């Protein structure tokens, strides 16, 4: 009494049902599976399933099903800027699969941007008492973590290389003149300390040759004046014309 009915185990015939579907119908079925499950659960089933998941068709169907304004725009981008079918030696999945999995558009591509994982992902040079990670003195709206990198007394530097292709943006999309990359950072000073800040951005090609560079040098904060945070951005956005041949940000 009160026992729940046991779930029936699928028979061998039921297990075989999907395998017997023609590729066109199987493609439609797989296109309803969430992206991560497609890769981790469906791809290892057999060679036929692996080939479908590795190819672009199932991912195009997923994009086409999203009828939001953003979804329609992404689908149009994927159709107008098809990725090289030869793919990339480092990635078994097609470029469109990586795009759907990693969702690079509209998110922050800087890893560990607020120091919530210490200095992981950053190359740092220590000056004075060196770098540290502390809680924000004032709230930074929209930040993934209310922590920040702090320095002391002398110039300190931190750098990060962002591989846009590994983040899910395929090269043909970068070359298409249809997307923009926006760069910004938050900075500020303690009330009892002055502060000088510089932001430099280098755009590199796949061979790490510099394509173009930008910088921002806001006015220094004087001692005993304020301790608020402010946003800074180079006097540019990485507009489509500058992304030709670009694959990395530094």
UniProtKB/Swiss-Prot annotation:
PROSITE patterns per UniProt: FBA (PS51114), FBOX (PS50181)
InterPro entries the record matches: F-box-assoc_dom, F-box-like_dom_sf, F-box_dom, F-box_only, Galactose-bd-like_sf
F-box domain span: 15-62
A Pfam family of this chain: FBA
Gene3D superfamilies for the chain: 1.20.1280.50, Galactose-binding domain-like
Gene Ontology terms: cellular component: cytoplasm; SCF ubiquitin ligase complex
Keyword annotations from UniProtKB, A to Z: Ubl conjugation pathway
Keyword Nucleotide-binding: no
Tagged with keyword Transmembrane helix: no
Residues of the FBA domain: 99-250
Matching SUPFAM superfamilies: F-box domain, Galactose-binding domain-like
Disulfide bonds: none
Domain of life: Eukaryota
Cross-referenced SMART domains: FBA (SM01198), FBOX (SM00256)
Any one biological process term the GO annotation gives: glycoprotein catabolic process
Main function: Substrate-recognition component of the SCF (SKP1-CUL1-F-box protein)-type E3 ubiquitin ligase complex. Able to recognize and bind denatured glycoproteins, which are modified with complex-type oligosaccharides. Also recognizes sulfated glycans. Does not bind high-mannose glycoproteins.
Quaternary structure note: Part of a SCF (SKP1-cullin-F-box) protein ligase complex. Interacts with SKP1 and CUL1.
Name the record gives this protein: F-box only protein 17
